[in-house]
């Protein structure tokens, strides 16, 4: 998860590498829970999406979330059991190649097939996003009709909830960084004042929101 930063402390410094690290253009799922229940739920969802779409999932935790004490209310959502549709070694021949390959696992440099594979990976991302909408990609806390909006993710959740208690604010908690919810742009558009809260210097969540919505959040 996000690096521990200064020893014994925490930081949300690895959002960018989780979203963009790797070779080439390929879909991935990145979730960022804010409490123990969400950690269980989002990890389960990540496994489900990984198995369904044969894609990489990353669950971003951090030291604060991992080592804090929580009073947990309620139980996590019912576990989703993913269906395993891939070939299992020992039952059939399985070929794995880091090179571009055909459906049989054989390496190829055929231009038509390379183009088709690249396009298929982008189409897969759209399918992942559509499927992820069945889950909570964001949560709205506080006064739902407030025009004062705070945006955050991960372990900043607890501090933000304490800060807005009894005040005219609502808190948009981002749970999916990739795919990211289209509702974020709608919520920002409805607000008069938007504040971004994240535990890093460069505003990595803010960069992602600007990239996907075209909106730069100045107050952070």
Identify the function of each model-found stretch.
Residues 1, 17-28, 196-207:
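Short, basic, helix/turn surface patches
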Residues 1-6, 25-32, 217-220:
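Short beta-alpha connecting loops at secondary-structure transitions
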Residues 2-4, 38-39, 66-69:
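Short, well-ordered, mixed-charge alpha-helical segments that flank or form enzyme active sites
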Residues 3-8, 32-36, 122-127, 169-172:
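Short linear motifs at secondary-structure transitions and domain/linker junctions
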Residues 6-25, 89-96, 100, 184:
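Amphipathic, alpha-helical segments enriched in basic
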Residues 9-58, 62:
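Conserved thiamine diphosphate
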Residues 42, 47-220:
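Flexible, low-complexity linker and terminal segments
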């Amino acid at each position: 998860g996000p690096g521990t930063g200064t020893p014994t402390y925490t930081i949300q410094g690895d959002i960018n590498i989780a979203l963009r690290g790797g070779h080439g253009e390929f879909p991935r799922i990145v979730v960022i829970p804010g409490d123990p229940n969400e950690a269980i739920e989002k990890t389960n969802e990540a496994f489900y999406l990984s198995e369904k779409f044969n894609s990489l999932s990353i669950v971003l935790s951090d030291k604060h979330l991992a080592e804090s004490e929580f009073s947990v209310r309620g139980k996590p959502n019912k576990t989703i059991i993913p269906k395993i549709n891939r070939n299992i070694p020992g039952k059939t021949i399985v070929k794995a190649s880091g090179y571009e390959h055909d459906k049989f696992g054989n390496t190829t440099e055929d231009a038509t097939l390379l183009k088709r594979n690249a396009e298929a990976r982008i189409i897969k991302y759209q399918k992942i996003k559509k499927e992820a909408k069945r889950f909570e990609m964001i949560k709205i806390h506080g006064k739902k009709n407030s025009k004062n909006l705070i945006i955050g993710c991960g372990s900043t959740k607890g501090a933000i909830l304490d800060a807005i208690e009894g005040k005219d604010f609502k808190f948009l908690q981002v749970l999916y960084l990739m795919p990211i919810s289209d509702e974020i742009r709608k919520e920002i558009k409805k607000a008069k004042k938007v504040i971004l809260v994240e535990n890093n210097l460069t505003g990595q969540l803010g960069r992602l929101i600007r990239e996907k919505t075209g909106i730069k959040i100045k107050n952070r």
